[in-house]
Amino acid sequence: DKAESRGLGDVYKRQIKKEGRPPLRELNNFMVSQLKNTISGVHILPFNPYSSDDGFSVIDYTAVNPELGSWDDITALGNEFSVMADLVINHCSRESLWFKNYEKNKAPGRGYFINGLEFEDLSQVVRPRSTPLLTEIHAVDGVKQVWCTFGEDQVDLNYRNPDVLLEIVRIIRQYVEQGIHFFRLDAIAFLWKESGTSCVHLPQTHELIKLLRLVIENLDPSAVIITETNVPNRENLSYFGNDNEAHLIYNFSLPPLLLYSILSGDCKHLKTWMTSMPPARSGRAYLNFIASHDGIGLRPAEGLLSPRELDGLIENIRESGGEISMRRTPQGDLTPYEANISLYSAMERPIDGEVDDFQMARFICAHTIMLALEGLPAIYIHSLLGTENNREGMVHSGRARTINRYHWEADDLYAALDDDGRHHKAVFAEMKRLIQIRIAQDAFHPNATQYTLHFSDQIFAFWRESLDRKQSLFALHNVSSERQTIPLVELNLIATEAWVDLISGFAYEDLAGQIVLEPYECVWITNKG
């Protein structure tokens, strides 16, 4: 239905705060007052008690961090929006009861974690971080080397132990009872470990996802599962399974490719990638995004951008105040893993260019493209607001990802959104306007037909058609800083129908004329205005 096309807002639980009010309650207030008729779902990043990584090192899965609010606040938000919660089930905190009991060799916790000393060959393990894979602990039953994919405070769970799986099932049941509708399986690709393998995307991991889907759909047949697998494109697509794994998969190649296209003024790689993407079958879809609480993943661009092009993008990000996080390869080398930068700040200058007047135009162009693509859009709250780099917070925390995790004081935010002299007001208004245009179009259903159109490499264009074939929509986007012209005859518009650009409202009456696109201008031309 139309609600499917509205998309998700991606938000940290503390990103809007007001003294004397729990952050989750203030978030609800902002969402209802500002986005009720624009966004249909909200992804609240981990809201449990945690020890590190901004929530992704969970101490207690069954509780809401009292500093943030309560389960009542989560339920209240769920009464207005579809709520997505993270299942951070690859690992949990060293401060959790489970891990403390593991060290004591008592239940619950005995056998819940992985002792790397029991694995003969770890030479092929794929790492998303540069930290050591194993961390030594002194437990009551001897010295162990616990497996830590993401860092020493985040200890991987042992799914060879069925008690671990039963714990996760109980947690899922509680979340469903509290009104959670979307389940994001965080870092799920690393779930199963096997000696002598990469320990990523293993067949056992896919079997566990199938099992979790059966459990979740048994509890709530309308629930939706999203897999978070920040990996090269082919591996990412495998998480659809045979209609028995994820309902939604993140389109991880989109952020680096779209950013490169906008900053280079050349979309040939974006077009090549899109023509290779199979359409998602009915009942499943791509989750399109270009910014999130994490950085912009660079691994999904491997094989799509050349090393020289990737180096150019990385240099541009650094010039715009961003950072590059590294991972360690099985050979021990450090290689770029993700770009840490606010998306608005990333649009500051073109590659090999200087700061210019097109920052907002580039930013809006990128989101206009994302909103038009096959799939469901997910928009990070700092993209809705046009938040810039939080370098002060990054330096204070010592974590690169903090650069894109700014915490707005509610009064400051509302003042910024009401100030004609600040870009936040214009960004927020235009983003909401584009989303509301999208909502009304049958051709933007997540599974509506999509075909790539081939004009110059400065124009990223595609055609969408509604499931009932009544609405045709041509989405054309100038990704360059130069004016572009396209003869209307190249679109093969049906002369007996009226064609209008939904974004500007301009009616195309002379089909022998031309479309003129100013720098970073976009048009959505349709026969159903």
Predicted features, each with a name:
Residues 1, 5-529:
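Active-site and adjacent substrate-binding regions of carbohydrate-active enzymes
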